[in-house]
Amino acid sequence: MLSQNIIDKIIRQDILVDELLDEELSIFCQTANLAYRSGKPIISNEDYDFIYLATLKNKEPNNPLFKSIEPEGRAFAEEKVLLPELMLSIDKAYSWNEMSKWIERLEKSGMLIGLDLNAIQIKATPKLDGFAGFDDGNRLYTRGDGKKGSDISRVFKRGLCVFKDSGRGLGAGEIVVKKSYFEKYLVHSFEYPRNFQSSLIKEKALDEQAQKAIIDKGALFVPFIKLPIWSGSMTELVAKFEEIVSQVLVMVDFDVDGVVFEVINIDLKTQMGANRKFHRWQIAFKENKDIVQVKVLNVMPQVGRSGKITPVAEVEPTLLSGATIVRVTGHHYGLVKEQGLGIGSVVELTRSGLVIPKIISVLKPMPVDIPDNCLSCGMPLVWESDFLVCVNHKNCPAQIIGRITYFFKVLANNDGFGIATVEKLYAHNIRSVSQIYTLNVERLMAIGFGEKTSINLISQLSRSISEKIEDWRFLAAFGMHRMGLGNCENLLKSYRLNDIFDLTLEQITNIDGFAELTAQVIVQGLVSIVDEYNQIYQYNFNLDTTVFTKDLQTLMHELFDKRIVFTGKMNCPRNEMKKHAKLVGIKVSTTISTKIDYLVIGSRVGQKKIQNAEKLGVVVMTEADYLSKITM
């Protein structure tokens, strides 16, 4: 057995994978797997799959860990019951080379039953990163060892719903939390979605966040048979493998850690069969992200508009996924302190596609420098959980400048008020958005702006007032904590903009989507902005009023409550069509997925976009078709 001290050193990478004996590596992989399945991961999925497990497989391909289903940990009841059906694990491939070997095995098995490679049909689904279970309609079981599992039917009694309101008894699936929901409501409380998912399953009483997630359908049981699929011939899979993987990975709003490929042909599935751990006709492709190791040159504190201090690591210029990386966020100072992120540290970075690079781990910890005072205003910093915060909200220059630039950025109907402009205004005693709206050309020129720039800035201020925007966007621009665009729109679906400052805690809590803790933050936020709001509102902004939910429910047309995406050049301005669609009870999105009901196309739309939409089950209609279904 490994001591806890040794395990901690491996986690911190004081001891690297190549320094472990084979037996130590095997024990650590088992320990990490148990922690993951108990909902308390000790290392990231990427590190487990691509560093530790990959090394173990290379050293000991016949290790028992690769021959049987991983145990699910001690978080579930000791008493196990027989599962209605076997729930095997899935074999994994981490490269095209490994996928090719699986395809070769399919071809050989096909030849034994007279099935040509081109006749083999394949389907692909997202590989969910949740808690596996089996729903027989009466009970829900954990996967356990694949034969016996624990009864966790309590999660349905707590109100957990099934994906797409599909009903019970659909067999194997996973308990997951929507990615968008986690990022909106839970990311500040849980490091990984799996930590939160485990709280839904355990026997202890649910906390407020778990109850809200169930009520909001942010957490769901997803039967595998209800997942969206790609299907096609083996020939097509080989020819378009990367494209298919990219397509399937974004099919659902859940954490996905790969793509599951499986044979459709029944006779071939029967021929290939299974071993003790997995079906031979099925495989999960898990793509390794680009990972580099780089030295940290400096760690600088950055003050956000809310006062949170973000550590920014300056690193040696490094090419990663086609981009040169010189700076990367350290997330918060709690992590800096815990991981030893300091000058001279060696860190592991990853970047997938166009995603912002992030630090996976600190390979070589160094002494850290935790600031005592705000870099901007000099006031002492305080700890709020894992975050260092400057509480000098009214007078901190960085926070003031951040709030002003945020206001104009969120309004999105103006140009010119970026950080350079606002910093110059601040240097001349401009401390609020309301003060900016009192400026004129002469004052701007006296501050040091040229005549042409001054005229343009005043023109942009006038534009921001006259150009129509949604009332919820106007409210969101004030930057209240937890009041982004979505929550502002939700609030204004129940109350008029000028009435919200008199709302009680109870009135906000009664709005669907706002728990008591969020309501408390909203009440405090409204108090903090009311004076500035009144100063700015007097300029009579051209605001589009949000339709109340109760009024939307009186609308009756074919597209009511449907999700649509507009694309291409429209006869009507596309932004106006989006706004009107919302006014008549249509849910407007910007990207195609299986959740979308209709794609409304104008001119100049690529055939590939239309084909992709149709593959996902999205109905395609022209602008004329759309207009005929609603009253414009």
Swiss-Prot record:
CDD domains: BRCT_DNA_ligase_like (cd17748)
Signal peptide extent: none
Keyword terms: DNA damage, DNA repair, DNA replication, Ligase, Magnesium, Manganese, Metal-binding, NAD, Zinc
Biological process, per Gene Ontology: DNA repair; DNA replication
A Pfam family recorded for this sequence: DNA_ligase_OB
Stretches assigned to the BRCT domain: 561-632
Role, per record: DNA ligase that catalyzes the formation of phosphodiester linkages between 5'-phosphoryl and 3'-hydroxyl groups in double-stranded DNA using NAD as a coenzyme and as the energy source for the reaction. It is essential for DNA replication and repair of damaged DNA.
Family that this chain belongs to: Belongs to the NAD-dependent DNA ligase family. LigA subfamily.
Protein name: DNA ligase
